[in-house]
Amino acid sequence: MLRALNRLAARPETRPPTPLLLPVRGRKTRHDPPAKSKVGRVQTPPAVDPAEFFVLTERYRQYRETVRALRLEFTLEVRRKLHEARAGVLAERKAQQAITEHRELMAWNRDENRRMQELRIARLQLEAQAQEVQKAEAQAQRAQEEQAWVQLKEQEVLKLQEEAKNFITRENLEARIEEALDSPKSYNWAVTKEGQVVRN
């Protein structure tokens, strides 16, 4: 090891000077050979008192938990302060954005309500006009039906009046009998199944 250090220290003067490495006391590396006096030595760990070991282990555990809790508390406090510092500006910005978005949505809602109201009014007007037209058509059809019914009844009345002229009444009974007797027309005949007329 000293030879390697000496080789590192002995450099030509053309290069910049480097700090001189000196051997120091300390642990050997795993690649260094053991001393001659310690070849074959078996190291035995010192005896440990179980009660003392348990107490030390418990105290170290408590110490680690306490330090971990303090570290976590300090970390949370620092993060909370950073968050509050950032959230102050962000919260104000978000509030402003929310107000602006709310105003835009309210304006859009008013425009949409106005448009829907105009469409509703136009639809109601069209429906009212359609109902009026339908009502007028129904009245005209009803009037035509009534007029046709009146004409039919008038025709029936005229027909009955024409037929009533040939009715036999008490006043014209004798005259109709005389007329039938004086008529040369004979009703004494019949029709067979074959359609032939048989006269007597």
Swiss-Prot record:
InterPro entries assigned: Ribosomal_mS26 (IPR026140)
CC annotations in GO: mitochondrial inner membrane; mitochondrial small ribosomal subunit; mitochondrion; nucleoplasm
Entry annotated with the keyword Ribosomal protein: yes
Modified residues annotated as N6-acetyllysine in this record: K159
A GO BP entry: mitochondrial translation
UniProt keyword annotations, A-Z: Acetylation, Mitochondrion, Ribonucleoprotein, Ribosomal protein, Transit peptide
Main location as per UniProt: mitochondrion
Subunit structure, as described in the record: Component of the mitochondrial ribosome small subunit (28S) which comprises a 12S rRNA and about 30 distinct proteins.
Membership in a protein family: Belongs to the mitochondrion-specific ribosomal protein mS26 family.
Name assigned to this protein: Small ribosomal subunit protein mS26
Natural source organism: Mus musculus
Lineage: Eukaryota, Metazoa, Chordata, Craniata, Vertebrata
Name of the encoding gene: Mrps26
